[in-house]
Amino acid sequence: MAAQSKQAKPSGKQGGKKIIATNRKARHNYSIIEVFEAGVALQGTEVKSLRERHASLVDAFATVDDGEVWLRNLHIPEYLHGTWTNHEPRRNRKLLLHRRQIDTLFGKIREGNFALVPLSMYFLDGKVKVELALARGKHAHDKRQDLARRDAQREVIRELGRRAKGMG
C-alpha cells in the first residue's frame, strides 16, 4: 500500500478573501442593482500599503471614460517604508474588467440614473479585487423606510427569541 504524502498547509487564507476595506455607507446611500468584481491596476507601494490594510473607500466612485473604467477618489496612504518611489494617495486607478462588462456598465449608466460605487476591496489569491456595484441613489424617505423596516425585523426576531426561551 502506497503512503500518501502530506504537505503542510500554508498559513493564512490562501484561497479565500482577505478583506482590506469596506464601504459601509454605500449600502445606506444607494440601492444596489448589480454587483461586479474587478481587478485593480496598482503600483508596488500601493500593494504594500494595502497589505497593511490601509485604504479608504468612503468617497470613492468609478467612471467609464473612453471604454475604460477608472476608480476615482480611492485613498491609499503612502507606504510608510517607501522612498522616492512612493505613490500619490488619491490618484485615479484603472479597473480591470472584461469588454462585455464595461459595455454593459456603460449602457446602463447612460440610460438611467446609476452610479458605480465600490462596496469592498480585498485580496483574492494574492490579487487586489474591488467589489463594484451598479447602484441608484436613495432619497431621504427611502433611507428612513429601510431603517424602519430593519428595526421592525430586528424586533420580530427579538420577540421570537423571547418566546422560545419562555420569557414572553
From Swiss-Prot:
Keyword RNA-binding: yes
Cellular component, GO, one term: cytosol
Keyword Secreted set for record: no
Keywords, comma-separated and alphabetical: Cytoplasm, RNA-binding
GO molecular function: RNA binding
Ranges where the record places region Disordered: 1-20
InterPro entries: SmpB, SsrA-bd_prot, SsrA-bd_prot_CS
Biological processes, Gene Ontology terms: trans-translation
Predominant subcellular localization, coarse grouping: cytoplasm
Family the entry assigns: Belongs to the SmpB family.
Matching HAMAP family: SmpB (MF_00023)
Descriptive protein name: SsrA-binding protein
Provenance organism: Mycobacterium ulcerans (strain Agy99)
